[in-house]
Amino acid sequence: MSPNQNCFFIVEFVPDGKGVPHFFDKDWIPDLPDYSFYDFPPCGDKFSSHYSLKAKTSNLSGDYFIEDDLASMDMCVLCDKLNVKFIRIPVEVELYRGRTPNKKYFLFFLKSYLSILDEERSIYSKSTDLKNENFNVSGEDERFFYDSIELFKVKDSVSENLFFCNELMLPVCSAVFKEECERLGLEGVGFKPLDDNYKYSAWDDLDLS
């Protein structure tokens, strides 16, 4: 079975309020540089070779804090095993009362940015630039932004195990990656099937009330 015959999954953050807190304040030493990862991965040259993080929580055991760009050693080892392209920078974490977590952590950025939507087989609507009535595009690759996707069919050529999906602006993984995460018991990581039941709307997370 080829990799693409398996379902792909959106990788989600699943907090438990304990070792995987919903949110915690962070003090970085030195300060992190300004960066955006929505169009392309951040430039590694902007970062220090290592960081210290004062995490304002009493416990930290999650393996992939997606919003914080923080991953455990176990997550990085799995990515190495599955040939995932990523940037890692060592982070020394200090918790409340000077405690240290049991796991080692790294700043973590995916390097593979893939457009995986098969437009011929999918059902979708693209966003428009209201200023000039043209499709809103970004950069030399002319990446479109999507208002909605009613049917998401993945291109047959997709074979990577973990990458940043350009259409959804989210991390997406293969079934192989999902199975390995579950086998290893990685904490704070969930998966939403990118199958025929999946629907996307750019307005879902906006409060328009």
Model regions: which residues?
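Aromatic- and glycine-enriched beta-alpha-beta binding-site module
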Residues: G62-I116
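Short, extreme N-terminal segment that most often corresponds to the first beta-strand
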Residues: M1-I29
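Acidic, proline/glycine-rich low-complexity IDRs
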Residues: S2-F8, N102-K104, F109-S209
